[in-house]
Swiss-Prot record:
Transmembrane segments: none annotated. Belongs to the eukaryotic ribosomal protein P1/P2 family. The modification Blocked amino end (Ala) is found at A2. Phosphorylation of Ser-97 converts eL12' to eL12'-P. This is Large ribosomal subunit protein P1. The keyword S-adenosyl-L-methionine does not apply. Gene3D superfamilies: 1.10.10.1410. The keyword Membrane does not apply. One of its GO terms (molecular function) is ribonucleoprotein complex binding. Part of the ribosomal stalk of the large ribosomal subunit; P1 and P2 exist as dimers which assemble on the P0 scaffold. It holds the Pfam family Ribosomal_60s. Keywords: Phosphoprotein, Ribonucleoprotein, Ribosomal protein.
Length: 110
């Protein structure tokens, strides 16, 4: 789980990104001070160095684009099993209807 210091730096970086401002150590520190959050001094520098040269907006907007392929493969397997499941349901319905004809409801008074 992320610590308070990590989350504070992440949120500060997201605020700067949303305002189209360059993410620098000084600006992250400014936001943290304005929010009244105290973090270890190495966190803002660590985050700004990790985010250098990355296109964060494209990363955020394309988060789910790579995930779509996995469910499609699982769906194909389920589609091949569907006819077998339908046949089983038909057989169960036939058995139930035969039992209903035999019972006729007279077991209610037993």
């Amino acid at each position: 789980m992320a610590s308070k210091d990590e989350l504070a730096c992440v949120y500060a970086a997201l605020i700067l990104l949303d305002d189209d401002v360059d993410i620098t150590t000084e600006k992250v520190n400014t936001i943290l001070r304005a929010a009244g959050v105290s973090v270890e001094p190495y966190w803002p520098g660590l985050f700004t160095k990790a985010l250098e040269g990355l296109d964060l907006k494209s990363m955020i907007t394309n988060v789910g684009s790579g995930v779509g392929a996995a469910p499609a493969a699982g769906g194909a397997a389920a589609a091949t099993e569907a006819p077998a499941a339908k046949e089983e349901k038909k057989e169960e319905k036939k058995e139930e209807s035969e039992e209903e004809d035999e019972d006729m409801g007279f077991g209610l008074f037993d």
